[in-house]
C-alpha cells in the first residue's frame, strides 16, 4: 500500500481537533516552554509558502519540547486591523469586518491543513472588541504615566485623497495610490514618548539571545550619541539658535548655520530681501519625504535667510541658511556647519562659496574635508589639543559662557501614534468644550469602533470617524458639559505590541492577564519571524513591555528571550516571489499534490533556516521520495507492519541509531533542521542495508521524524501498535558507549608497504596484534623466505613489519 497523504493527513487533523491534543493546561508547577510565531496579517491572498517556513520551525520545537516533558504554549492569532482591509473596503464598498472574517477563515483552514500544533482555544484577533478593550486600557496607562501626548507634527498630507499618509505610502513626493501630490503639513497628532525608554531599550539588548545584526539595527535606530548643546545668539534680535553637535571641539571652524525649512525661527529672522526666496524654498521642501531630503547622493540645495548668528567662542558673525537636508525632527532642527571637517558641509560650502576654516591639522582643505584625528589649530584655547581633550575643554568653555552644555542625543523620535483612518482601535479620549481632555473611564471599555458604510476619508485630515455624529458627540451626565471623542485611530502596530501577553490568558474579562500565569509563561522562549520587523514591531513591543514592567503588570524586563529570523524563500530563478512575476507558489497546491508533511520536510531541508533559498520542484519531489522510502520500509502492501521490524537486537544498527538520536537532538536545539533531516536519511539508508530492524530503534526514529512530519509520524506510530498519540511520548535518548565501534580497522605494512587491512577488537594488546598480523595470508606471502628484523605495533592503528 502506498502512502496516501490526503487520507492520512485529514485523518490525523480530525483526531487532533476532536481530542484537543495540543490544548495547553496552565500547570504552573511544570517546566514551561513558550514558542511564538509572528502572527500574520490575514490578507486576501491567503498563506504563501514563506509563512510555513517560520511556522514549521516553531512547530518542530513545540512538538520536541512536549516530548521532553515541557508544558508548551504554542498559540496563533490574527493581526487584523490596518490599511489593506480598509483600502479593499474603499475600493469595493464592502465592510472591512466581513473581508477580515473571510480572510481569517481561509488562513485558519490553510494553517490547520499544514498540521501545526496550535492551541486554538487561545486564538486572538486584534479586531475583536474583547481584545482591543485591553489595547485601549494599555493606552490609558500610557496616558496616565505621561507617555501619551498631543503634539503638532509635520505629516504627509494628500489633499486629493483627503488623508494623511505614512512615509511608506509616499514615493517621490506623490501618493503610492493614484500618484497625487503630497505635502508636509503640521497637524495635531497623538505621540508616544518612546524616547523616555531609549537608554533602557539600548542597554537591555545585551541580555538577549538575538542575532547580533538585528541588535545592531535597533542600536542604530535608537542612535545614541554624546556631544554638546550649543547656543548661538541671532544678531540684532532676541532669538537663539540651538544646535546639537558631537564635535563641539570644532566650533571655531563653524562658518555658517543651517536650519531646517520648518524651523520655528525661520520666518521671524528672515530679512525682507530674502523672504520670497525662503518662502518658495519652504514650499518645495514640503513636497519631499525625509528620505529624499537626506539622500547623500543628491545635489545640495539651500537659501540664505539674510540673518547672522554670533559664534559663542570666536565672536565671529556667521550666516544662517536653510536647507532641506536638515530635518526638523532630528536633534534641534539646526546644525552648526564645519565645512573643513565634514563632507556634507564641505559640499554645501563649496557650492555656495561659504568660508572654510581649518581647525584640525592633517588634511588639505583646499581639496577635501579632513575628517581624521589631529591637533587643533585656529581654535583659541583649544590650540594644540587632540580631539578628546579638545571636546572636554570646549564644553567647559561653553558652560562658562552660558552658551552650551554636555548632552546626549538620540536619533530615535517619539512614536507618531495616530492614524486618520477608520479600520483601527478608537483612541479612548474625549476633548471637552472647556479645552480639557480626559480618557474614557476604564469601566466603559471597550470603546467600540462604530459600524458604518461611510469609511471614506473625511477630507479635513480627520479620520472617517469624524463623519459619525453619534460616535463623536458626547455629554457629561454629571455636569452637562459637551465633548468630542478623539476621531483618530491607533496604528496597526498597537495590537501587535502585546498580543503575546493575551495568549497567556485570552479569556480573562477582568484583567489583561492573570499575574501568576504571566509569571509562569514569560518571557517568550523562542520567537521566530521575518527580519522586516527588526526595528518597528520589535522596538515598539519592547517599549510597551517595559512600561508594563514599570507598572508592575508583567514580571520580566524583556518580552522575547530568544529571537530568530527565518530566511526568505525565493522563486526558482532566485528572484523574490511576486504576483507580477507569476512565480508565487500556493501551499494549497503543494498540500494537494505532495502533502503537508512533504512541504514541511522540504522547507526545513532546503538549507539553514536563516538563509535565503530558491524554491525547487526537484527538491520537493526528493522530500516526498524520502517519506515514501520510510513508509515502504515499515509498511507492507496490505497495510500491515513489515516483518523486517523485529523485537530482537542483532546490534547492526546500534551505532547509527545512537548517533542519529545524538545528532538530531543537538540540531533541534540549535534550529539546525536541515542537518537533522540529513541524519534521519542516513539512518533509513542503513536500515535498507540490513535484514532486520530493531523495533525500539524504528520507534525512536518515528519519534524524531514526527515533529517535522507529524501526520506520517502519527500513522506509523499507530502501525507500530500504539493506540495513543505520539505527541506526548518521551523523546528518545542515546547511549554514549554505543556511539563508537567496538572494532577498529588496522593497517599492516611490510617494509613500509601496505599489505593488509584487518578489523580487530578495540582492546587488542600489542602482542595479539602482532600474532594476528603475522597470520594474515597476504602478509605471510610478503615475508616468505625473509628474516623478520622487527615488528612494531601501534594499538588501534597499525602493525609495521621490517623483514630482510
UniProtKB/Swiss-Prot annotation:
GO terms under cellular component: cytosol
UniProt key word Acyltransferase: no
Annotated ATP binding sites: 579
Catalytic activity reported: tRNA(Leu) + L-leucine + ATP = L-leucyl-tRNA(Leu) + AMP + diphosphate
Annotated keywords: Aminoacyl-tRNA synthetase, ATP-binding, Cytoplasm, Ligase, Nucleotide-binding, Protein biosynthesis
Motif 'HIGH' region positions after renumbering to this chain: 40-51
Keyword GTP-binding: no
Cited SUPFAM superfamilies: Anticodon-binding domain of a subclass of class I aminoacyl-tRNA synthetases, Nucleotidylyl transferase, ValRS/IleRS/LeuRS editing domain
Pfam families per UniProt: Anticodon_1, tRNA-synt_1, tRNA-synt_1_2, tRNA-synt_1g
Renumbered ranges of motif 'KMSKS' region: 576-580
InterPro entries, per the entry: aa-tRNA-synth_I_CS, aa-tRNA-synth_Ia, Leu-tRNA-ligase, Leu_tRNA-synth_edit, M/V/L/I-tRNA-synth_anticd-bd, Methionyl/Leucyl_tRNA_Synth, Rossmann-like_a/b/a_fold, tRNAsynth_Ia_anticodon-bd
GO biological process: leucyl-tRNA aminoacylation
Enzyme class: ligase
Location(s) in or outside the cell: Cytoplasm
E.C. no: 6.1.1.4
One Gene Ontology term of the molecular function aspect: leucine-tRNA ligase activity
HAMAP family linked: Leu_tRNA_synth_B
Family under the similarity heading: Belongs to the class-I aminoacyl-tRNA synthetase family.
Protein name in UniProt: Leucine--tRNA ligase
Organism: Staphylococcus aureus (strain Mu3 / ATCC 700698)
Amino acid at each position: 500500500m502506498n502512502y496516501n497523504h490526503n487520507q492520512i493527513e485529514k485523518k490525523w487533523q480530525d483526531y487532533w481537533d476532536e481530542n484537543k491534543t495540543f490544548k495547553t493546561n496552565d500547570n504552573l508547577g511544570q517546566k514551561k516552554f513558550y514558542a511564538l510565531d509572528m502572527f500574520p496579517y490575514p490578507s486576501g491572498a491567503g498563506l504563501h509558502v514563506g509563512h510555513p517556513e517560520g511556522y514549521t520551525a516553531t512547530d518542530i520545537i513545540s512538538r520536541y519540547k512536549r516530548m521532553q516533558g515541557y508544558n508548551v504554549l504554542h498559540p496563533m492569532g490574527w493581526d487584523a486591523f490596518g490599511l489593506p482591509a480598509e483600502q479593499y473596503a474603499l475600493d469595493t464598498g464592502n465592510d472591512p469586518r466581513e473581508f477580515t472574517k473571510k480572510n481569517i477563515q481561509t488562513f485558519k483552514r490553510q494553517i490547520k491543513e499544514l498540521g501545526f500544533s496550535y492551541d486554538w482555544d487561545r486564538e486572538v484577533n486584534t479586531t475583536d472588541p474583547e481584545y482591543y478593550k485591553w489595547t485601549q486600557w494599555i493606552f490609558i496607562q500610557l496616558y496616565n504615566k505621561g507617555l501619551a501626548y498631543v503634539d503638532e507634527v509635520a505629516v504627509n498630507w494628500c489633499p486629493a485623497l483627503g488623508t494623511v499618509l505614512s512615509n511608506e505610502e509616499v514615493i517621490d513626493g506623490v501618493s503610492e495610490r493614484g500618484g497625487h501630490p503630497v505635502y508636509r503639513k503640521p497637524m495635531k497628532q497623538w505621540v508616544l514618548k518612546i524616547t523616555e525608554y531609549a537608554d533602557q531599550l539600548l542597554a537591555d539588548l545585551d541580555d538577549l539571545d538575538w542575532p547580533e545584526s538585528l541588535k545592531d539595527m535597533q542600536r542604530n535606530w535608537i542612535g545614541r550619541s554624546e556631544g554638546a548643546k550649543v547656543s548661538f545668539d541671532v544678531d540684532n534680535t532676541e532669538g537663539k539658535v540651538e544646535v546639537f553637535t558631537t564635535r563641539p571641539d570644532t566650533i571655531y571652524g563653524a562658518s555658517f548655520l543651517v536650519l531646517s525649512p520648518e524651523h520655528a525661527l525661520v520666518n521671524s529672522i528672515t530679512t525682507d530681501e530674502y523672504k520670497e526666496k525662503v518662502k518658495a524654498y519652504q514650499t518645495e521642501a514640503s513636497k519631499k519625504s525625509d528620505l529624499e531630503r537626506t539622500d547623500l547622493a543628491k545635489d545640495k540645495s539651500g537659501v540664505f535667510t539674510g540673518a547672522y548668528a554670533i559664534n559663542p567662542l570666536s565672536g565671529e558673525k556667521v550666516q544662517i541658511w536653510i536647507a532641506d537636508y536638515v530635518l526638523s525632527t532630528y536633534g534641534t532642527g539646526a546644525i552648526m556647519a564645519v565645512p573643513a571637517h565634514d563632507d556634507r558641509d564641505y559640499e554645501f560650502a563649496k557650492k555656495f562659496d561659504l568660508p572654510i576654516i581649518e581647525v584640525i591639522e592633517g588634511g588639505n582643505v583646499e581639496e577635501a574635508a579632513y575628517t581624521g584625528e589631529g591637533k587643533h589649530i585656529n581654535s583659541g584655547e583649544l590650540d594644540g589639543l587632540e580631539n578628546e581633550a579638545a571636546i572636554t575643554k570646549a564644553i567647559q568653555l561653553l558652560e562658562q559662557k552660558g552658551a552650551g552644555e554636555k548632552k546626549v542625543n538620540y536619533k530615535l523620535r517619539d512614536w507618531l501614534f495616530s492614524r486618520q483612518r477608520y479600520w483601527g482601535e478608537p483612541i479612548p479620549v474625549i476633548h471637552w468644550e472647556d479645552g480639557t481632555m480626559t480618557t474614557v473611564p476604564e469601566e466603559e471599555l471597550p470603546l467600540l469602533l462604530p459600524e458604518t458604510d461611510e469609511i471614506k476619508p473625511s477630507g479635513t485630515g480627520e479620520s472617517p470617524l469624524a463623519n459619525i455624529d453619534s460616535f463623536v458627540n458626547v455629554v457629561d451626565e454629571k455636569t452637562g458639559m459637551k465633548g468630542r471623542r478623539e476621531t483618530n485611530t491607533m496604528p496597526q502596530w498597537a495590537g501587535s505590541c502585546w498580543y503575546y501577553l493575551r495568549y497567556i490568558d485570552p479569556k480573562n474579562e477582568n484583567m489583561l492577564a492573570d499575574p501568576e500565569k504571566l509569571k509562569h509563561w514569560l518571557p517568550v522562549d523562542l520567537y521566530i519571524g521575518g527580519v522586516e520587523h527588526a526595528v518597528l514591531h520589535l522596538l515598539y513591543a519592547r517599549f510597551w513591555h517595559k512600561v508594563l514592567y514599570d507598572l508592575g503588570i508583567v514580571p520580566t524586563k524583556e518580552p522575547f528571550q530568544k529571537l530568530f529570523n527565518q530566511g526568505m524563500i525565493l522563486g526558482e530563478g532566485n528572484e523574490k516571489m511576486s504576483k507580477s512575476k507569476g512565480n508565487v507558489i500556493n501551499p494549497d497546491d503543494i498540500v494537494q499534490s505532495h502533502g503537508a508533511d512533504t512541504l514541511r520536510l522540504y522547507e526545513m531541508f532546503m538549507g539553514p533556516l536563516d538563509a535565503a533559498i530558491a524554491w525547487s520542484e526537484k527538491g520537493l519531489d526528493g522530500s516526498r521520495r524520502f517519506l515514501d522510502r520510510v513508509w515502504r520500509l515499515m509498511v507492507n502492501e496490505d497495510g500491515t507492519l513489515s516483518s523486517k521490524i523485529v523485537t530482537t537486537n542483532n546490534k547492526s544498527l546500534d551505532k547509527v541509531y545512537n548517533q542519529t538520536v545524538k545528532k538530531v537532538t543537538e540540531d533541534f536545539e540549535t534550529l539546525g533542521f536541515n542537518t537533522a533531516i540529513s541524519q534521519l536519511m542516513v539512518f533509513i539508508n542503513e536500515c535498507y542495508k540490513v535484514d532486520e530492524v530493531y523495533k525500539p530503534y524504528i520507534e525512536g526514529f518515528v519519534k524524531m521524524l514526527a515533529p517535522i512530519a507529524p501526520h506520517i509520524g502519527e500513522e506509523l506510530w499507530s502501525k507500530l501498535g500504539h493506540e495513543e498519540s505520539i505527541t506526548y511520548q518521551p523523546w528518545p535518548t542515546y547511549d554514549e558507549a554505543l556511539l563508537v565501534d567496538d572494532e577498529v580497522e588496522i593497517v599492516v605494512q611490510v617494509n613500509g608497504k601496505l599489505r593488509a587491512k584487518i578489523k580487530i577488537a578495540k582492546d587488542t594488546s600489542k602482542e595479539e596484534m602482532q600474532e594476528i598480523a603475522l597470520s594474515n595470508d597476504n602478509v605471510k606471502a610478503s615475508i616468505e623466505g625473509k628474516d623478520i628484523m622487527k615488528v612494531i605495533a601501534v594499538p588501534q592503528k597499525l602493525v609495521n613489519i621490517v623483514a630482510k
